[in-house]
């Protein structure tokens, strides 16, 4: 059994001691990073979340502490009292913040012993993610993981401080709510008291934050847990955290402006970076046409160019078929890549096919000639205009896709990113923000044979497009906006519908009968009857934002206890079976 503190109080954190503390008697507590025995002296590197300090045990200073330290091993938890001493110049360790000093120990308490951990507690440790997640409490001791979670904490602190001083109120919304499935599946919670009835866990606080605006709270925020029973996808978590914000009496520009200031403050406080505001703005249409995606990475060029008008009369069958089927022909210019070997070109063709393209046309531009499988199918004039449109020079490689717009955009967007990485065109130290605005309000779902909301059913249409809602739904633009950073969407929001009649029209276009709409959202429709202010807001994915700011490879590295890609907690073995007794109480039978 470990020793008790018996009134011993920690005076300093390990990583915070400096030469200013020389000759002070201090008490430090933490874990043993490593132990080195040099005969008459034993050195312990003691670690806590602030860093490491070297502690020296000498028989001459304290024979009791020296004798006790002989049994100490890695990851033992110790309390040490001793005197801070300046190291001699040749013993200074510039790799650690406390490298100019060490502690000569007078007292040692072994608070807790440790078995040999399954992997070394250090950043260089080469261990599988599965083992790290199984022993997450050990993984979290590693300095990089401690730093990640401290940065995450700093982000939420900056958010709270900023919003508090700007008149926002932090309000919690319920976790047990009514199931209103639209989009991802709800996690359901059976009610024991009302057999056969279920609560849902919230996919977002969306409806409640709108109700708070109707309640008169004006400016709301919350660091909210959200849960979605989604199909398994890489780097998605069944539970995630949102920075959730809503404001009354605002238009799009008001929401964008205050959020730009908040983001700038987050980056200033966490990374020491001055982010220029206002951010760039791109309409959804422009973003798709220039980058093939509504999540553009603006750190490099290689923009898409539409070649459809140039090849409109072409006899080349590939182009002809695409244009006949209301598709398009678009291309990108990979500067200086004309000499790419045939094997790599073939790999790019296969890469394009994974995104639904039937093929990929390449054109190599050299000083005196142009090489391409399509040379014999294109007229001299067509080739000349293609080279001009793509601003081709000797040494460039042109890549062209002809198909339906969605396939052309998706393929070229992924090719652009892939080649940007291959040719080191992306500056990893750059942060390029952009607002994507004027999204389509609706999309048509071929599977369900109905219109679905691009964002959610409460998004307001642009005023000038309202009359198109029933006549030409796909032409209606939304008062919606996404914030994209380096090709990753970190947040999104909209101005909401605050009028009962317009909300009814929206539900009708989405294929909801009046009864179905009332059954799911009647409480919101009822609230609209009693004076709803114009309102709008935004939600950020905190996990994704923290991942970008910390430079992590996966969101699992910025969440304390994440699930795997298979939505499993390897540490606690959740989800797990429950007893027959528990199921009986809930009136549930498992039918597998």
UniProtKB/Swiss-Prot annotation:
One of its GO terms (biological process) is aspartyl-tRNA aminoacylation. The record marks 38 as: Important for tRNA non-discrimination. InterPro entries: Aa-tRNA-synt_II, aa-tRNA-synth_II, aa-tRNA-synth_II/BPL/LPL, Asp-tRNA-ligase_1, Asp-tRNA-ligase_1_N, Asp/Asn-tRNA-synth_IIb, AspRS_core, GAD-like_sf. L-aspartate binds at residues 182, 228, 455, 496. PROSITE patterns: AA_TRNA_LIGASE_II. Its main location: cytoplasm. Keywords: Aminoacyl-tRNA synthetase, ATP-binding, Cytoplasm, Ligase, Nucleotide-binding, Protein biosynthesis. It comes from the Bacteria. It catalyses: tRNA(Asx) + L-aspartate + ATP = L-aspartyl-tRNA(Asx) + AMP + diphosphate. ATP binds at residues 228-230, 237, 489, 541-544. It holds the Pfam family GAD. One of its GO terms (molecular function) is catalytic activity, acting on a protein. The keyword Thylakoid does not apply. CDD domains: AspRS_core (cd00777), EcAspRS_like_N (cd04317). The keyword Repeat does not apply. Its EC number is 6.1.1.23. Gene3D superfamilies: Bira Bifunctional Protein, Domain 2, GAD-like domain, Nucleic acid-binding proteins. Residues 206-209 are annotated as: Aspartate. It is found in: Cytoplasm. GO terms for cellular component: cytoplasm. NCBIfam families: aspS_bact (TIGR00459), PRK00476.1 (NF001750). Belongs to the class-II aminoacyl-tRNA synthetase family. Type 1 subfamily. Aspartyl-tRNA synthetase with relaxed tRNA specificity since it is able to aspartylate not only its cognate tRNA(Asp) but also tRNA(Asn). Reaction proceeds in two steps: L-aspartate is first activated by ATP to form Asp-AMP and then transferred to the acceptor end of tRNA(Asp/Asn). Homodimer. This is Aspartate--tRNA(Asp/Asn) ligase. The lineage of its organism: Bacteria, Bacillati, Bacillota, Clostridia, Thermoanaerobacterales. The gene is aspS.
């Amino acid at each position: 059994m470990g020793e008790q503190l018996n009134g011993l109080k920690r005076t300093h954190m390990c990583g915070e001691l400096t030469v200013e503390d020389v000759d002070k008697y201090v008490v430090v507590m933490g874990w043993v990073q490593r132990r080195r025995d040099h005969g008459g002296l034993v050195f312990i590197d003691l670690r806590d979340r602030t860093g490491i300090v070297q502690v020296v045990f000498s028989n001459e200073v304290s024979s009791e502490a020296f004798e006790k330290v002989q049994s100490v091993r890695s990851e033992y938890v110790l309390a040490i009292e001793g005197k801070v001493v300046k190291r001699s110049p040749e013993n200074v360790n510039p790799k650690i913040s406390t490298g100019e000093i060490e502690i000569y120990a007078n007292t040692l308490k072994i608070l807790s012993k440790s078995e040999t951990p399954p992997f070394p507690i250090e950043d260089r440790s080469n261990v599988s993610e599965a083992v790290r997640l199984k022993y997450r409490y050990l993984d979290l001791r590693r300095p990089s993981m401690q730093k990640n979670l401290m940065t995450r904490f700093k982000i939420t602190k900056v958010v709270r401080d900023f919003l508090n001083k700007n008149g926002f109120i932090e309000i919690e919304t319920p976790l047990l709510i009514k199931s209103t499935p639209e989009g991802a599946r709800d996690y359901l919670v059976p009610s024991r008291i009302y057999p056969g009835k279920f609560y849902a866990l919230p996919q977002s606080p969306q409806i409640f934050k709108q109700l708070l605006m109707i309640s008169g709270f004006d400016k709301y925020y919350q660091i909210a847990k959200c849960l979605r029973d989604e199909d398994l996808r890489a780097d998605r978590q069944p539970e995630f955290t949102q920075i959730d914000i809503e404001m009354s009496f605002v238009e799009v520009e008001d929401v964008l402006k205050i959020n730009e200031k908040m983001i700038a403050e987050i980056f200033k406080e966490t990374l020491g970076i001055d982010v220029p505001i206002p951010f760039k703005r791109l309409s959804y249409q422009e973003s798709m046409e220039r980058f093939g995606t509504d999540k553009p990475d603006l750190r490099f060029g290689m923009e898409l160019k539409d070649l459809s008008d140039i090849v409109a009369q072409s006899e080349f069958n590939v182009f002809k078929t695409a244009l006949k089927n209301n598709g398009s022909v678009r291309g990108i210019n990979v500067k200086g890549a004309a000499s790419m070997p045939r094997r790599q070109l073939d790999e790019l063709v296969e890469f394009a096919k994974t995104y639904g393209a039937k093929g990929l046309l390449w054109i190599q531009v050299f000083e005196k000639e142009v090489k391409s499988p399509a040379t014999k199918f294109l007229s001299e004039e067509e080739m000349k205009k293609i080279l001009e449109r793509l601003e081709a020079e000797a040494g460039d490689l042109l890549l062209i896709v002809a198909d339906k717009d969605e396939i052309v955009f998706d393929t070229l967007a992924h090719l652009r990113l892939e080649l940007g990485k291959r040719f080191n065109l992306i500056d990893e130290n750059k942060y390029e923000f952009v607002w994507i605005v004027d999204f389509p309000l609706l999309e048509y779902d071929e599977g369900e044979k109905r219109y679905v909301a691009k964002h959610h059913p409460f998004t307001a249409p642009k005023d000038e497009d309202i009359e198109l809602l029933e006549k030409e739904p796909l032409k209606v633009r939304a008062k919606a906006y996404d914030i994209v950073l380096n090709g990753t969407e970190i947040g999104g929001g909209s101005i909401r519908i605050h009028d009962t009649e317009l909300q009814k029209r929206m539900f009708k276009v989405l294929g909801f009968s009046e009864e179905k709409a009332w059954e799911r959202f009647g409480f919101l429709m009822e609230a609209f009857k009693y004076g709803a202010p114009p309102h709008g807001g935004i939600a950020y994915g905190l996990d994704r934002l923290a991942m970008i700011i910390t430079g992590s490879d996966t969101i699992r590295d910025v969440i304390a206890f994440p699930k795997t890609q298979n939505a499993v907690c390897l540490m606690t073995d959740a989800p797990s079976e429950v007893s027959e007794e528990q199921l009986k109480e809930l009136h549930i039978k498992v039918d597998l």
